[in-house]
Amino acid sequence: MGPPPSLYTHAVGPRSRLISAVAAAAIVLVALAAPARATEYFVAPGGVGNGSGSFPFGRIQDALDAARPGDVITAAPGTYAESLSSVRGGSPDAPITLRAAVARTAIVTRASRILTVSHAYLVVDGLVLDGQYAPDDTVRVTSSGNFLVLRNTEVRRSSRDLIDMAAPVGVLIEGSLLHHALNAAGGRTDAHGIVAGAVRDLTIRDTEIHTFSGDGVQVDPDRAAPGWDRVTIEGSKIWLAPLPGPENGFAAGAVPGENAVDTKAAPTNTRSRITVRDTVASGFRGGFINNMAAFNFKEYVDATVDGVTVFDSEIAFRLRGPATGALVLLRNAVVYNVTTAFRYEDNIQNLRLWNSTVGLNVSRAFQAASAPKATLDVRNLLSIPALSAEASSASNLRANASSFVDASAHDYHLVAASPAVDGGERLDDVTIDRDGLARPQGSGYDVGAYERAPTTARGQAPATGPAGTR
């Protein structure tokens, strides 16, 4: 069962669907490889038994105390007023799995931390973890909580962070809903959706994060050695909106958060790498801070941003130097309904903005801040706002609404008569568009985030696979 519908919907792109399908197949293989002697423990509210199907435990923690590698804990629908801690780890081919019998119906809640993971190879699937706005993280993952899988799980209501990780390796957060990390102390205090230290190989996939007073995702506030690396965010949604009513000290109408993604990394560490693809961010405006941005890439990071959409925000991408600042490759982006699409600062170097579309209701495509010596490489940019000096390359084009299928509905696919069709230059690092269609489809690269597919005799674009195969 997938995540429940929310007020904010987004269709996962073909690349994310392919990645998710591969991941699902791997999960099946792991399940088949589980030891034949694995035990399934059952838990139900009010149970007083030994964990059997007919005589279940009453507490999930009792099952965690008993579980060994390969075992499965199944929690019946209901409310469990307890805090949970891992007791022992699983193994690569035999994780310990804690799952809800019916997704999102087993609710673990109390005014405290709800889950502490300090052992490797634990899978948490389909639970609701509710911290009741306690002054603690809802989920804490220590540096020993390697290869945690948090799948199809709702994590909510913290006055600190919803998920706080030290420096584990290989954590996967997938198909989950994280919301309401709010701390109104001092007017507004950081409470993040996900915050991580020197993590490695963290993946956040097909996950929705909203309503926080810090950042949706932040790495690493402590800038700890040896530094974080290989963080991936894909197929996800990160958003803010004015609060519909008073909430944990904030007034109705407040927009308490800062950024969808915020990076911090010490120049004495190895440069930290982050990839964000097929992800949507919105609502980053009208808050408590100046220069409110969806994506705030700064310090010693190497960021690849592909197929990202930003709207209803003050700044879509805030990109910050200097030479020891962010290295950024941004391609296949679509930006609309923002004040500034790209703000570049502090003499950022080697900023590459390729094959992206700046749509309607954007006050300015570029804004420089303390950046007289910044170096930008802007190519194949398609922009409804006027092109500025940053986009002086001949491959960049100004467009009007008639170049697109339906600009008023923010559908920025190209029509056949658009001057952007075959009007760009070849970029070897941009091999597909944001739909997964191979570039080029015609005699040359199209300008902007979308490649226009050739039409069949009936005037319909042919079906394409995730990499543009037919």
Where is each model-derived feature located?
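Surface beta-loop-beta hairpin patches that serve as ligand-binding interfaces in beta-rich domains
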Residues: 418-470
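Feature marks extracellular polysaccharide-active and adherence modules
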Residues: 76, 87, 99-101, 118, ...
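Predominantly extracellular beta-rich ligand-binding scaffolds that present long acidic/polar faces
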Residues: 83, 87-89, 93, 278-281, ...
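Extracellular beta-strand/beta-solenoid scaffold signature
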Residues: 85, 93, 109-115, 133-142, ...
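Bacterial N-terminal signal peptides
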Residues: 22-31
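Right-handed parallel beta-helix/beta-spiral solenoid domain characteristic of secreted/periplasmic
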Residues: 72-77, 89-138, 182, 399-402
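Acidic Gly/Asp/Thr-rich repetitive segments characteristic of extracellular carbohydrate-active
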Residues: 43-82, 418, 446
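Detector for repetitive beta-architecture
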Residues: 40, 70-72, 77, 95, ...
